[in-house]
Design a protein with these regions (language model features):
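Residues embedded in well-ordered beta-strands
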Residues: 4, 58-59, 88-90, 101-103, ...
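Acidic, metal-coordinating catalytic segment for phosphate/diphosphate chemistry
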Residues: 54-97
């Protein structure tokens, strides 16, 4: 091995362990004292815990939209604009006149992006090692309290989403491949259990 001085602004362009990228981001943000625990399996980051709270790890995608074998923490994915996966579920209600209504959620103002905006009925990032459908079912349960079965969701398309901007004084680059599902079973809005952090 060797030792060399590297300008701070060039560190992120180097071949680093993913845990080092998280550590460097925290230093850049001038985070106060923190506890960061990392667990690797071979060379792959499997778990990252900051101050006792698990961080979201996402699979990065290759040029074909498939998991590349590389995993990265969510805030770094959005800082770098890395391609990743999400699931979107639209809850649809048929009206008597043949039209349709969509159930929208108004995002919490505390969200890291698009706070206070209306959004898809239920959506979320797909954790590393998981799949679109299982993630869609989990998000529907967590965000709205709807316990759906796999056959209750109908895949209606795949969407490549791109956005580059900023929120809360931070760079935000979103490059995502989303599987879009529709849920059409009857829903009584007053019986839904909303996830405070999301809605």
């Amino acid at each position: 091995g060797t030792l060399e001085w590297v300008p701070k602004n060039e560190i992120d362009s180097l071949n680093l362990w993913e845990g080092d990228r998280i550590f460097h981001r925290l230093l850049d943000e001038e985070a106060p004292f923190f506890s960061l625990k990392l667990r690797y399996q071979d060379d792959l980051l499997k778990e990252a815990v900051l101050d006792g709270k698990p961080l979201e790890l996402l699979d990065l995608l290759d040029e074909n939209g498939e998991p590349s074998g590389q995993v990265r923490e969510r805030t770094l994915v959005h800082l770098n604009g890395d391609w990743h996966r999400t699931s979107h579920v639209w809850v649809v209600r048929r009206r008597g006149d043949g039209g349709h209504d969509l159930l929208l959620q108004k995002r919490s103002r505390e969200k890291d992006s698009f706070g206070g905006c209306y959004d898809i009925s239920s959506a979320g990032h797909i954790p590393a090692g998981q799949y679109y459908l299982e993630s869609a079912l989990r998000e529907l349960k967590e965000e709205l309290g709807i316990a759906a079965e796999p056959e209750d969701l109908r895949l209606v398309g795949v969407h490549d989403g791109r956005y580059e901007g900023g929120f809360h004084g931070r760079i935000f680059k979103n490059h995502e491949k989303s599987h879009v599902f529709v849920y059409e079973k009857p829903v009584e809005i007053e019986k839904l259990k909303l996830q405070k952090e999301e809605v």
